[in-house]
């Protein structure tokens, strides 16, 4: 399903989704705009509430500093196991292709709910 992630988070009951993806959310690359990024500890907590034990959170970006922020945010929720950086099968998105064309490295993070 493709939809506005924030709208779905607010409306869905716990355990609704087995797999949640946020692929290439807006990186807000200017330092003064970093606080506008979607992936933060509150977002991770809300997403983990939506998945059952064994469910996964998949994040992807082509901005290294955003990847660092995503890694740190995933670590804030103890219900998640360590994030893997092995890319799971998925289509190449338009934003991903833009990043590749610009020479940026793609980072995929996949964390599984363990408790």
Regions found by a protein language model. Give the residues of each.
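Class I S-adenosyl-L-methionine
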Residues: 69-115
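Short "lid" loop at the C-terminus of a central beta-strand within the Rossmann-like core
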Residues: 7, 27, 64-66
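Glycine/threonine-rich flexible loop motifs
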Residues: 29-38
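Conserved Class I SAM-dependent methyltransferase catalytic core
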Residues: 51-78
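A short acidic, Gly/Pro-enriched loop at the edge of an enzyme's catalytic core
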Residues: 6, 10-19, 24
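Conserved SAM-binding strand-loop segment of SAM-dependent methyltransferases
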Residues: 1-5
């Amino acid at each position: 399903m493709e939809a506005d992630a924030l709208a779905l988070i607010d409306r869905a009951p716990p355990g609704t989704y087995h797999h949640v993806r946020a692929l290439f959310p807006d990186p807000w690359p200017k330092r003064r705009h970093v606080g506008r990024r979607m992936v933060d500890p509150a977002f991770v907590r809300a997403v983990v509430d939506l998945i059952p034990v064994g469910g996964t959170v998949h994040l992807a970006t082509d901005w290294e500093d955003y990847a660092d922020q995503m890694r740190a945010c995933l670590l804030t929720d103890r219900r998640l196991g360590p994030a893997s950086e092995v890319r799971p099968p998925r289509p190449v998105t338009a934003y991903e292709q833009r990043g590749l064309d610009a020479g940026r490295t793609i980072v995929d993070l996949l964390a599984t709910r363990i408790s």
